[in-house]
Amino acid sequence: MSEEIILEARDIWHSYEENDRFSLQGLDLKVKKGSKVAFMGANGSGKSTLMNRLIGQKIAITSNKPQTTRNRIQTVLTTEEGQIVFVDTPGIHKAKNKLGEYMVNIAERSLNEVDVVLWLVEPSTFIGAGEKHIIEQLKKVKTPVILVINKVDMVKKEEVLTFIDAYRKECDFAEIVPVSARRGDNTDELVNVIMKYLPYGPQFYDEDTITDQPERQIVAEIIREKALHSLNEEIPHGIAVAIDQMKMNHKVCHIDATIICERDSHKGIIIGKQGSMLKKIGSTARFEIERLLDCKVNLKLWVKVQKNWRDSDYMMKNFGYREDEM
């Protein structure tokens, strides 16, 4: 079902009087609560970890490296009450190249295309320039903004309360919800709070759908995640992963992928002594891809230099960073 048809059906739904809506809910029209919810958060705040926790499966990659999330990733949680489409956006930051501009544009556009915004922060009373910049952006948003305090299992309760007071003075949040994405503490309550603010309307996806990402893209992101975990600080910003081939043969998925970097010196580091680093990235990625696809995987990796690819619209589109597909 196209998004235009869904939005038209939602308009028809809202045209009914409240009593008529109540009567219609008894019919199998899939008219429950449901809409899109944007995830925002600084590097290392745990956005992807929380989103994976909420849907019960790993879709978004996790790393403490800056700007890990590059595309707008949508995951779907369907309950008896309705459907939440979580939109994991790249963080808002000062762009240094076209890739950075692409990421910031996606993040800012997403804020105007959802019914609820979740802003994920770590428990600290220090509100710096970066946080204040995001707060100013959120004040322009017409939809409810829920402040989610992650990693509360790492601090004392009194510190969390002090932190809540500090942020309340900065912005009028619709709700403030403390959670631990790592342990799953209070995440069910977060879902209940989100549902309070969602409109009634048809669901965007079938009940068994958990993401809009194609398998090839998820596989590419898994490989990139393992590279992020293994490589030095200066390299991850300049790498991308292209899936050259992915096919099933005799119950084994054969995948050929290329890790793209920007410098010849980086290529040597990614390969490692006698191929040791590339083997490490490949083995850890293969294990997780097998869990995702539920089959044996034969993964072959290559490394290729594409200088300044982050400033090339053509190469960015080749590597899956396309605004026209948003």
Question: What is each PLM-predicted segment?
Answer:
Residues 9:
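Conserved catalytic Walker-motif region of ABC-type ATPase nucleotide-binding domains
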Residues 153-210:
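Canonical P-loop GTPase G-domain recognition
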Residues 2-6, 15-26:
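A short, flexible loop at the N-terminus of ABC-type nucleotide-binding domains that lies
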Residues 105-174:
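Conserved C-terminal guanine-recognition region of P-loop GTPase G domains, centered on the G4
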Residues 48-96:
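Conserved G1/Walker A P-loop phosphate-binding module
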Residues 18, 32-33:
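Residue at the conserved pre-P-loop
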Residues 40-42, 63:
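The feature captures the beta-strand-to-loop junction immediately N-terminal to the Walker
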